[in-house]
Amino acid sequence: MRASLAVLALIALTAGCGSATSPSKRSAPTPGSLQALWNQSEERVGLIPGTTDYSPGDLRISFLVVDHRGRVVAPPKARFWIARRLLNKPFWQTVARLENVGVPGVTTSEPVKALYVAHVRVPRAGTYWVLARPLGRVRIGGVTQVVVNEHSTSPAVGTRAFPSHTPTLATAHGRTSELTTRVPPDRGLLRYSIAESLTAHAPFVVTFATPRWCTSRTCGPVVDVVQAARRQFASSLVRFIHVEVYAGNDPRKGYNRWYREWHLRSEPWTFLIGADGRVKAKFAGSMSLRELAAAVRRFLL
């Protein structure tokens, strides 16, 4: 779980090397700086990020807040700040909302039921610091670094979707085990390929995810959410597609060619593609049904 390892390193840095990130005995942080705001927390931790692929513009940042005992802290809202450095004053402040990443009655075994999601605007590439402080009785604050690259590694919003000839029920002769690791399989997500949908000028949602092999604490039941959205928009012309990420659905064989064609470096990823074949929106990692449904209404209907 790479995200968790990164956070453990961050916690070690902030706890063991106080002179780098915390005020010394001789000087206090500038009032209003991110460090000063963090110092107001009774318990200071590192955030567990759910998203990492960022480029300048509007950012959707998802994360978990976990206390020192390993317990998820999850009031409905959290105050959220972003700054260039810990000792700088934040240039953006907002409220992160807790989003349910499962589907009631469908998702039952996930240890994490919700993630915080914050929306901020970052004008240029660089390394930033963010602070989240859940609103509630427990005064806990979490920080982490956010690296904004010049360009996203995943397909950017506005670019043309790659016409991958992803497998379908027809090409697999109905053998669902070749197409999905989800149990039970949702055949409605396996009917169409990306290439055929682009040729038909059909708007669609495609998720690259592996229900069986996703091990990150923040990857969530993405296919369950996409299935629920498919049912919600069954009367529309929007198609919903699930693509596994490993060759032969076996992690030992590495990523499959469709995953590589889309230049993905993590999973899960969910993209909304318009009738014009261009990426309209995308979600890295987990998202809620509320978020996905709102995006479908805004961009695909």
Residue ranges of model-derived segments:
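Bacterial signal peptide processing site
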Residues: C17-T21
